[in-house]
Amino acid sequence: MSESNLSSFISTNYFNLRSAANSSNSISKPSTKKSIRNQKSPTNISSWALKKKTLQIAETTWENNEKDSTHSHYLMTGSMASRTATSLSRYSTNASLLGPSIDCVLCCIYEVPRDISTRIGLCIINCNTGQMYLSDFMDSQIYIRVVHKLQIYQPTEILIPSSSLAPTVSKLATMIKFNVAETVKIEEGSRKCFNSQDGLAAITKYLMDDTKKDLKIEEIIDKTFALCAASAAISYMEEIISKSSRNLNAFRKLRIQFEGTENTMLIDSKTVRGLELVENKLDKNGISLWKFLDTTSTKMGQRSLRNSILQPLTDRGSIEMRLEALEELKANDDLLQKLRLEMKSLPDLDKLFSRLLCINHSAIKPDQRINYVLLLKETLQSVKSLKDALNDQLIQSRLISETKKIFNNDAIMEIEKLINSCINEDCVWASSAIQLLNQRSYAVKSDSNGLLDVSRQIYKEVKEEFFREVEDLTAKNKINLDHNYDSARGFYLRIKRQEFTDDVATLPDVFISRTIKKNYIECTTLNIIKKNARLKEVMEEILLLSEETVDELLDKIATHISELFMIAEAVAILDLVCSFTYNLKENNYTIPIFTNNLLIRDSRHPLLEKVLKNFVPNTISSTKHSSSLQIITGCNMSGKSVYLKQVALICIMAQMGSGIPALYGSFPVFKRLHARVCNDSMELTSSNFGFEMKEMAYFLDDINTETLLILDELGRGSSIADGFCVSLAVTEHLLRTEATVFLSTHFQDIPKIMSKKPAVSHLHMDAVLLNDNSVKMNYQLTQKSVAIENSGIRVVKKIFNPDIIAEAYNIHSLLKIAKARTENEDSNGVVDQKTINQMKRIHNLVAILKECAGNEKEPLTLGKLKEINSDFIENFEE
């Protein structure tokens, strides 16, 4: 199979096997870039706001639910006539309550352009969920971490200091320009807006009051660059809200979190795109690792999965806590199914709870606050079901035990008591306009307000008068009258057309505002119009009195906001590990362990194994002393690129805390991952080679012993002489860094030269020459390099004219003769190489024995020792 068609093949075939529901999870970004406007520096925050389109945050509107009385009016997509009839779903929650599905994210980046160092302060505010993330770090010369953060959070608007744009555009501003979509607005602010003291004051103001508040302030007090970014971001947000408060959520508190760079793996943006971690390169709706692994039940879990893919864990203890949870859930299938089923009923908790952070609950329209309370109550009941499911089990894993502890928090019962003290317990979701009317009228308990009881009695009397009016009109005019209600007209009359066959003009004059519909004739009377006016007045009084009670209730619930967000985070992590466990069982994955060496037995490509029959697994092995740098050679289309991507994807999955597609997996913890994988669809020229080398020169400085580096076709697109020299020099440098490196190359002399080094291993993708001179690919990695002469010519034999193929063979023969004349074989070199290979096998034996001795799950047995010994003796003399 052609490597260039790999992505499209996976996308086409995989979607034939998997439900199309997952296609809704894709995140698409336009490929074109936005140029930075080199505008005059503003003098204050206000001048920014005059130039920019305000952040788009939809208000929670519910009018559309009540416009057409001939249809069911859903507060959620799906009938909710009773709480137990249909569970809530993350896809069914009405977006008008929880806001738009695409988050509005503000990102403020602070730098000092003239400073030699590349220190960065970052502040990201999610305007839908009320979350703020702060970072302060030293970046590389090409700002890999900044671009990484932009890729993770996908901001809709970016703020940078005016000094980054004038008098000259800084390198950071240029990197931002080329790594965001054209829909992202890039704005500037004056230097005085970036003030660390103002930032600290703003954070103190917006930080939620809980037991960890002082610790959080202490954590960020010396992060001056992050505080500068926070100062400008919060000032900008407040300025925009003050100018357009109707369309924006005015948060009184924010969920503030400082994100260090030491606990997550750094994956540069080109690696993210090349490995197709979150988006397919060829088709934005195509398959990616994120979409493939996404079997989550909630929006929170889905976001957590994406973040885990882009930022795998580097803290070994945290990874092993997730793996421990996988072990427990794997052994308890009933619990796994019950938890996944219960979580499917949950709405987006981050967005739901964030509405309580807004000033005066402005994110919830007054006439919809009862609906919000009902959704909150429904959510807490689902959380209690999760709690009951966990309480019924003897939980051993630390991670699930912690979520169980959070679900047993007394705050849940206290919030339920508060709701039940104000809202009638039999109040449920409405499915029609008249039910909505009754719900608003009777949701609040009668003993909450004396005036409310009086208004309700009047409301009841007016409705009874209307019903009597309908009965009188029916009896007087000998017409079978029906009635209905919608929010625009109030009550009105309906006559079935099949029962009234006469002309509409023959109706008595008392019936006015006649409208002919498909099945009904709709009309009203003057008396009904008067009663509707009276009913509207009474309803306004009821709603006003009810709103006062509900507002007080929301204020009391908001005092438990910290506990509610703890619940949201607990659900997210529980959903994530349940998703990992589901994938583990469905895809026959194994749970990895973490040691000092990389050993993956019979590894499989997680996506390709699902669409290719008889996928050939390969064992991956890398130790520091004998094979830290592995050079892969082989024919074109022999599977080198697939193997290299496979290595990277499996390492990412392991550090996410997920199962892996292999029989066994032992991993070191990598803190950086850089991959440059071949894209055969792109034209390869010397200019591509120059760009490749220039880019590589930048991130070579970012490589250390904890880096995993994947290089596909090192030196591709280059001339033979120059490309070979540079590629060999790069390989030599990579060896000195002691990083874990997997690279493939078309320069056959590189492995010949480098394999004499103790830490270098040369592996080959096996292929067989058949009797008809065609080449059969076995896709199997071997240590024996068997070169098939003219393999490239044989692969394209059926494509070109026979005369061209014959000429190619002739040229190859001439080049082979010329090379033989100049080669000076050194027989001692053969002896030296054999000695080196034997030393490598000794190092490998030591590493394997240490691995087996430290593996508590698979104790070292006599039989296993004999197997290792036999394998070592058999291969030692090769």
Swiss-Prot record:
Q: Which organism is it from?
A: Saccharomyces cerevisiae (strain ATCC 204508 / S288c) (Baker's yeast)
Annotated Gene Ontology cellular component terms: DNA repair complex; MutSgamma complex; nuclear chromosome; nucleus
What family, per the record? Belongs to the DNA mismatch repair MutS family.
Recite the UniProt keywords alphabetically.
ATP-binding, DNA-binding, Meiosis, Nucleotide-binding
Q: Which GO terms describe its biological process?
A: reciprocal meiotic recombination
Q: State what protein this is by name.
A: MutS protein homolog 4
The molecular function terms of the Gene Ontology recorded here are:
ATP binding; ATP-dependent DNA damage sensor activity; mismatched DNA binding
Q: What does this protein do?
A: Involved in meiotic recombination. Facilitate crossovers between homologs during meiosis.
